Regions:
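A membrane-topology feature that recognizes alpha-helical transmembrane segments
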Residues: 1-167
Length: 167
């Protein structure tokens, strides 16, 4: 029990610090495009600190409790960027490719490394299948709602599906 608690607590503290940094970075509104500059400012987003801390801490505690450290490169990129993506999406209803693309790349590399380092190729393949299924499901919603679900949402669903499929 203690072996899972200590990494979880340490990661929670690191996540809180990263959450403070993310919140301050997003407060500059540098992610906004030219046509989004006139939108109202979103105000203070203290929830970013808590979600960063809890997501990183809970994933680290789970990885330690299950000894599934091979999945860390698959799960951590989304945990680290998820709060920022949520804040940006809530503000401008857009998920920037400059965040999604590296997260997708690291997640795919994480799936490949999981297959090589002991997580097994079945884990990597199920992660890829999860990403394809989630991406395809949201692509269907995009087509059915005529763009009500955006392309960024489809990309994010594929990343989440890959991470969830690997677990």
């Amino acid at each position: 029990m203690l072996t899972a608690l200590l990494p979880g607590l340490a990661a929670t503290a690191i996540g809180a610090v990263l959450g403070i940094w993310t919140s301050r970075t997003l407060a500059t509104l540098n992610y906004r495009l030219d046509d989004e500059q006139d939108l109202p400012k979103p105000g203070r987003r203290w929830w970013i600190i808590w979600t960063s801390a809890l997501s990183l801490g809970s994933i680290a505690a789970w990885l330690a409790a299950t000894s599934s450290w091979a999945l860390a490169p698959v799960l951590l990129p989304l945990a680290l960027t998820g709060p920022a993506l949520a804040a940006i999406d809530l503000d401008v209803m857009r998920l920037p490719n400059r965040i999604l693309a590296p997260v997708a790349a690291v997640t795919i590399l994480g799936l490949a490394s999981t297959g090589v380092t002991g997580g097994g190729w079945a884990t990597a393949v199920s992660g890829l299948i999860g990403g394809l299924v989630a991406g395809a499901a949201l692509m269907m919603l995009n087509l059915l709602t005529r763009g009500g679900v955006g392309i960024g949402d489809i990309k994010l669903a594929a990343i989440i599906g890959s991470a969830a499929g690997a677990v």
